[in-house]
A protein has these predicted regions:
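N-terminal, positively charged/glycine-rich alpha-helical extensions of SAM-dependent methyltransferases
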Residues: 1-24
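Conserved alpha-helix/loop element of class I SAM-dependent methyltransferases that forms part
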Residues: 33-51
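Class I SAM-dependent methyltransferase SAM/SAH-binding core
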Residues: 56, 62-113
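A short acidic, Gly/Pro-enriched loop at the edge of an enzyme's catalytic core
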Residues: 112-123
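A short glycine-rich, Lys/Arg-flanked "PGG" loop and its adjoining helix->strand segment in the class I
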Residues: 137-152
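Short, glycine-/aromatic-enriched active-site segment of Class I SAM-dependent methyltransferases
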Residues: 158-179
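Short alpha-helix
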Residues: 180-196
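C-terminal helical/coil "lid" or tail adjacent to the Rossmann-like core of SAM-dependent
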Residues: 205-255
């Protein structure tokens, strides 16, 4: 596991309460994860998310994943947990706009200690967001606590690839992204297994090196004005952000960072 011990929850909250969060939504859409709807559909299919099920989205952000599951998988109810009040306020507004308020519940809490009752959910869901969590072992423990016996943990995340980053590369990447740490597929698998879960086909989706050029094209070719407006027309900052994204692309092409996908079943 690579770590950036100077990064904490308050730093992540600052990102998603300010211009950086709006910039990510500009580039990636409401579904702020690599692959958008295609990625969500793929994860839901692999996890066999059931119609009529009850799920919890840990690090739900704007609630787009919850609304996807309500609309495309016809789940009965989704709970969403996030520690950033700004994004939860927007999530509630968007749930109301899509007419699903009665089928969602939002909880402001640390995802490592949600306060939700144990054994209450058919599945736990996450999309490219657990990389922001400081204590990933506690996150996995909380995820499995929330599940009924036989329940499913299904998530994608930004992970370290099969070729490790150097210490210098990891520090630069984690600092730019405000990730306190980054796990590999093997590390997530080990944590799930130690929490009595059977892990099914952990894999690299292969999307990372294909999608970062798309985001770069949008910020450098099409949405440049929009991006500059979000960051107060600070062209020096825009250049720095572009440079860090090109660096991130080089890591993805080298297999050092990936979008990993994991589906696991709680024993019992």
């Amino acid at each position: 596991m690579k770590t950036a011990p100077e990064i904490h929850l308050r730093d992540v909250q600052a990102v998603y309460s300010g211009p950086e969060g709006r910039l990510w939504e500009l580039l990636m859409g409401e579904q702020i994860h690599i692959g958008g709807l295609q990625s969500s559909m793929d994860l839901a299919e692999r996890a066999c998310i059931p119609a009529g099920g009850r799920g919890v989205d840990l690090c739900c952000c704007l609630g787009a994943g919850m609304r996807f599951l309500l609309r495309f998988r016809n789940v009965a109810h989704m709970s969403g947990v996030d520690a950033t009040p700004t994004v939860l306020a927007l999530a509630r507004e968007r749930a109301e706009a899509e007419g699903v308020t009665s089928r969602v519940t939002f909880v402001e809490a640390n995802v490592c200690a949600t306060g939700l009752p144990g054994g209450s959910f058919d599945f736990v869901w996450g999309e490219d967001a657990w990389c922001y969590v400081e204590d990933k072992p506690k996150l996995i423990s909380e995820s499995t606590r929330l599940l009924k016996a036989g329940g499913i943990v299904a998530f994608t995340d930004w992970m370290e690839g099969s070729t490790p980053m150097t210490a210098e590369e990891a520090k630069r990447f984690l600092t730019f992204m405000k990730f306190p740490s980054i796990f590999s597929l093997a590390e997530y698998t080990a944590q799930l297994q130690s929490n009595h879960c059977e892990v099914r086909a952990p894999q690299d989706t292969g999307r990372f090196p294909k999608y970062v050029p798309l985001y770069l094209d949008m910020i450098e070719r099409q949405l440049t004005y929009d991006a500059l407006k979000i960051i107060g027309f600070d062209q020096a900052l825009a250049g720095a952000l572009s440079g860090e994204m090109h660096f991130m692309q080089s890591l993805a092409e080298a297999g050092k960072i990936i979008q990993g996908l994991i589906v696991a079943r709680k024993n019992g």
